[in-house]
Regions:
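Short, glycine-/small- and polar/acidic-enriched structural segments
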Residues: 2-156, 162, 166-172, 188-190, ...
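Extracytoplasmic/periplasmic, Sec-exported soluble proteins
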Residues: 16, 25, 43, 100, ...
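Predominant activation on well-ordered alpha-helical scaffold segments within soluble catalytic domains
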Residues: 25, 71, 127, 176, ...
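Hydrophobic alpha-helix position signal
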Residues: 27, 33, 73, 130, ...
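Short linear loop/turn motifs
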Residues: 41, 142-145, 255-272, 310-324
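Pocket-lining segment of extracytoplasmic ligand-binding domains
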Residues: 155-254
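Secondary-structure end/capping motifs
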Residues: 212-304
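Conserved C-terminal helix/tail region of periplasmic/extracytoplasmic solute-binding proteins
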Residues: 292-340
Length: 340
């Protein structure tokens, strides 16, 4: 049994427990955090913005949000630092229904764009992406939050189907959720952002990372194991999550099989971006200076941030060796033996 490392509070950037971010909860549910000597609490913050502000205010130790939040936080003097690359590819895009005639960002002029997660920082990212494509986000488009919560697939699908919005600024998992509702989406090419990596990261305050490195290293290692488990057996990951968190399962009156297919589809979309194979540094949690520099150049060029800094300020790789200090074979064997 590992020595006790104490408590760690994770502020979840979602309205409720969800398979979209299954490894965060599975790190605890599968016993990986306990084996590290960590007493982990995952508190629902409700939104990415609330999670970030909670960590900055000291109400939690870390959250998992898009790396854009860190750049914008530094720009206002809050040293909120990514230390583990959770999603290795770009996970934000503009999408349209598969049957839509819209094929480019330029064709969004005059359209209403639905917002999947309506946070100021994510709006800033959307505006920057449009500016990069030559679209004026203030004059050429209208933004409108999608109906319900960002996890309420039926309500969001109804709004898109009705034509109330022509496109969506979405998190990758929305594609899986909508596919589960019979509404396949197609991402629009966005050369200015498609190559920017990583996207979602584990992020904490600089001083906390310096004061408790063993704690953050242990949690990152547990998340790496849970991610590998989910990659190996996504269906088992959803089942484990539902067993430990019934509120993540079917809504009252909802067909369980339909809900399972939808949640599995969303998780599989997310997991495709969490693979480390092909990443600039193919180790769990790693971020490179070149990646951080590319993000900074994009955000500066589109006016999203005002100040240039050494790229290394925007991330920490100090714990990457610790994240990867485990036997992947043991995790894979467990996942494989956990049923179809």
């Amino acid at each position: 049994m590992a020595a006790s490392l104490g408590r760690l509070t994770v502020l979840a950037s979602v309205p409720h427990v969800t398979a979209n971010f299954a490894p965060i909860w599975l790190a605890k549910d599968l016993g990986y955090t306990a084996a590290e000597g960590l007493d982990v609490t995952v508190e629902i913050a409700g939104s990415p913005k609330d999670a970030v502000e909670g960590v900055i205010a000291g109400r939690g130790d870390l959250s998992f949000v898009n790396i854009v939040f860190s750049f914008l936080a530094y720009d206002r003097g809050a040293p909120y630092r990514p230390f583990y690359a959770f999603v290795r590819r770009q996970n934000r895009s503009f999408s349209v229904p598969e049957t839509s005639p819209i094929r480019s960002l330029g064709e969004l002029r005059g359209k209403v764009i639905g917002l999947h997660y309506d946070d100021p920082e994510l709006r800033a990212f959307a505006r920057a992406a449009l500016v990069g494509a030559g679209v004026d986000p203030e004059r050429d488009v209208v933004f409108k939050p999608l109906a319900g919560s960002p996890l309420d697939a039926p309500k969001m699908a109804a709004m898109i189907r009705s034509g109330e919005v022509a496109a969506v600024w979405q998190l990758d998992v929305l594609s899986g959720l909508m596919a589960g509702e019979g509404l396949p989406l197609r991402s629009l090419p966005a050369p200015e952002i498609d190559g920017l990596t990583p996207s979602s990261c584990l992020e904490a305050m600089e001083d906390a990372l310096a004061e408790r490195p063993a704690v953050f290293a242990a949690f990152g290692r547990a998340v790496a194991k849970a991610t590998l488990f989910a990659l190996t057996n996504p269906a088992a990951a959803v089942r484990f999550l539902w067993q430990h968190h019934p509120d993540a399962g079917p809504a009252p009156g909802e067909d369980p099989a339909h809900a399972f297919r939808r949640e599995l589809a969303a998780l599989e979309v997310r997991l495709a971006s969490q693979r480390i194979e092909g990443a600039p540094d193919p180790r769990w949690g790693a971020i490179t200076e070149r990646e951080a520099a590319a993000w900074q150049e994009f955000l500066l060029s589109t006016g999203a941030i005002a100040s240039r800094r050494p790229p290394a300020i925007y991330y920490s790789n100090a714990l990457v060796d610790a994240f990867n200090a485990f036997d992947p074979g043991e995790v894979i064997d467990r996942a494989t033996s956990s049923g179809p």
